[in-house]
Every structure is written in structure tokens, then in C-alpha cells.
Amino acid sequence: MERVYNFSAGPAVLPVPVLEKVQRELLSYNGSGMSVMELSHRSELFQNILDDAESLIRELMEIPENYKVLFLQGGASLQFDMVPMNLANGKKAAYVNTGSWAKKAISEAKKIQGVEVEVIASSEDRNFSYIPEIPTVSSDAAYLHVTTNNTIEGTAMFDVPDSAVPVVADMSSNILSSVYDVKKFGLIYAGAQKNIGPAGLTLVIVREDLIGQVEGLPSMLDFKVQAENDSMYNTPPTFAIYVAKLVFEWIKEQGGVAGIEALNRKKAALLYNYIDQSDFFSSPVEPSARSLTNVPFVTNSAEFDKAFVQEAEANGFKNLKGHRSVGGMRASLYNAFPIEGVEALIAFMEKFANARKGGEVRV
């Protein structure tokens, strides 16, 4: 079956070689006569998968030994609660508000009893079209929470501020797509369904000294319990971890995160350059803050936007509709998205624009 160009913001496109390997191994993994989905999580076969996945992500992100790597469940949304529960410890928590997901993290932290949330910077005044300057964080704060890529609004934070307190980062939509120095962070978390693998897995990278600060937490929500049990306090998402391991292998073959970032910059530059020179399409994001992985764009008409999404869908360009909260279009160019798809999209955009410059709307 012919593949389409899938611009979904998540779950998102996976590398074809990974999907092909999953297909080959689906009925019998490693000659076992069992699918990965059927393996006991306590078996040697799965333990090897888990160990390999951790080893690979440590290599790809250059994770120091004094950080734990956890393969959890509940999505990044559960980390909105786990982070303040485990790290706040009666102190103030500083947050930067750069978009919809940051707002949700802030909202959830405020629900945790005993946690005082301070929003120290925000770009909401201009519809989250830029990354705000982050002031010095008080040393009596428990942590500083940032969102490195704002999936809905299409902005990214590439320069992480130096901070006297641990920096916590939601990297869900640009982990492994840009190089970050893990040592600058106290904790990194990311839902898997954009650059890592299938939905259902959450990656957490946490510095050891931040674990076990709060006693009496529910076991499933306690980083200490999860770390002491090597991500297997309960049955982990075994199939998602297996696919993640294959994706990590694929990234390594592409030249690691640095190689992936170079390709991502080429893909994003192609699309942004076309949008910027177009007199039909435009970007709502300030150039200095533009994401490499999520590219929103609009026409000057909601009717044209609707027509574009419908015709794009009919021509094999799937999931280009912008998030319901912002409208317009959004092209998500995650690691596995091919540069040929960007080139094909640009050609389609040019054709669409030329046909509409006289004011015609075709649906």
C-alpha cells in the first residue's frame, strides 16, 4: 500500500525501516515463537530490550551516570502532576508559560496541595508567538519548568537558561530532534508519540539527587519507587519500549541527534523560506522562535484555510489542520518525516495559491 505524507502532531510518523522490522518480527521475536507483545516483562528477552533501549538513549543524549532513565506510562500529562509532587517539597515552583501545554502544566501544579506556583515569564500577551526572556529564578524555588517546544503554537526554546535551581523540561515534541545538554537539566520528560515511538510510553530522565525528596507519595507516582524498580514496578508498556529501541537504533544510524538536527533544520528551512516569500501564506511565529518540528501557517482567509486542508487531504497530505485552539494549518516535521514530503507540500501550496489568487475557493 502506498504511504501518504503524514503531518500529524502526534501520534506521528515513524521511520519506515522501523515499521518494516516490526512487521518482520511481529509473530516471532528473535526466534522465540512469540510476539514482543506476548513476552513476559520479567523475561530475559524483554530485559535485554529494556537494557538496550536505556543504553541507546544514554548514548544518543549523552546522559551522565548520575541521571536515572525511566520508561513510564501516563503520557507527559501525568508528569504535570508527578513533577510538583516529587520536586516541590514545600517550596515555590517557577514556570514559564509559552503555550497550551505549558498552561496545562501550570494548571496541574496548582492543584497539588502545598505547591505554590509562580509564572515568572509568559508570551501569552502576543498569542504565544515568541519565547519570552526568562528572569533570574530565586534560589529558594524548587525548580524552573520550561517547555522546549510548543507543539500547538510552533515555537521552540533552543537556549536553555542557566539557573541556580533545577530546570525541568517538557521535551515531548522535540526530544531527539535537537541537541540539548542534559547536564543543564534536573529533569526531562517526553511523551513518546512524536519522536520516540507509539503512544503509551513516557520517557523521564531525572538527576538522582532529585529523587526521594518527598515521602509518602502513591507508589505509581513516586520517582523513587519507579527508579528502584527499574521502570518495572508494574507491567511497563513493553511493545512501545521495543519500538522505541528500534527508533533509537535508527537515529544512531542517521548520525545521532546532531545528524537528525541537521536534517530537521533543512526541512524546516525549506518550508519557512517558502512561506516567508509567499504573498498568500504567512507564519504567525516570530522568526527567532520558530520550531523545527511544528510549523503553523495561515492564509488571509478562514475559508481558504478550510479549502486548503480539504484539498491537501484529498491529495495525500494528511493531518495538516491546525489545532482547534488556533486554527489555520500546521505541518509537523518530526524526525522520521522525509524531506521529499516537505518539497511535495511546497509544490502543492504553490499550486493552491496560484489557483486562488483570483479569489476562487474550491472545496
UniProtKB/Swiss-Prot annotation:
SUPFAM superfamilies xrefs: PLP-dependent transferases (SSF53383)
The biological processes this protein is annotated with in GO are: L-serine biosynthetic process; pyridoxine biosynthetic process
Top EC class per UniProt? transferase
Indicate which residues the UniProt annotation says bind L-glutamate.
42
Q: Which reaction does it catalyse?
A: O-phospho-L-serine + 2-oxoglutarate = 3-phosphooxypyruvate + L-glutamate; 4-(phosphooxy)-L-threonine + 2-oxoglutarate = (R)-3-hydroxy-2-oxo-4-phosphooxybutanoate + L-glutamate
Q: For this UniProt record, give its keywords in alphabetical order, as a comma-separated list.
A: Amino-acid biosynthesis, Aminotransferase, Cytoplasm, Pyridoxal phosphate, Pyridoxine biosynthesis, Serine biosynthesis, Transferase
Is the keyword Amino-acid biosynthesis in the record? yes
Q: Provide the cofactor list for this protein.
A: pyridoxal 5'-phosphate
State the free-text cofactor note: Binds 1 pyridoxal phosphate per subunit.
Summarizing the function annotation, the protein's role is: Catalyzes the reversible conversion of 3-phosphohydroxypyruvate to phosphoserine and of 3-hydroxy-2-oxo-4-phosphonooxybutanoate to phosphohydroxythreonine.
Q: How does it assemble?
A: Homodimer.
Q: Which HAMAP family does its entry note? A: SerC_aminotrans_5
What is the similarity comment for this entry? Belongs to the class-V pyridoxal-phosphate-dependent aminotransferase family. SerC subfamily.
Q: What is this protein called?
A: Phosphoserine aminotransferase
UniProt source species: Listeria monocytogenes serotype 4b (strain F2365)
The coding gene here is: serC
